[in-house]
């Protein structure tokens, strides 16, 4: 049995920062114009009504409203933002 501690290699001990991708605002959530909806690589989800697409394929809201995930056809998912319903009070 060794009674000396093994010395750790100084070449280890690093890792890269994760990209923090994914959905940031879910269906039914109220968003403001400019809010990021999805961070993604490639167009896994396409922009729908009132949604813009950034240079890195990030989807963001163009108007204040409510998020809705939809299927444009069988395989093409899209996210849209619809104006929030104004309650009569």
Curated annotation (Swiss-Prot):
InterPro entries: Ribosomal_bL27, Ribosomal_bL27_CS. Residues 1-24 are annotated as: Disordered. GO terms for molecular function: structural constituent of ribosome. GO terms for biological process: translation. One of its GO terms (cellular component) is cytosolic large ribosomal subunit. Gene3D superfamilies: 2.40.50.100. The keyword Cell division does not apply. Keywords: Ribonucleoprotein, Ribosomal protein. Belongs to the bacterial ribosomal protein bL27 family. This is Large ribosomal subunit protein bL27. The gene is rpmA.
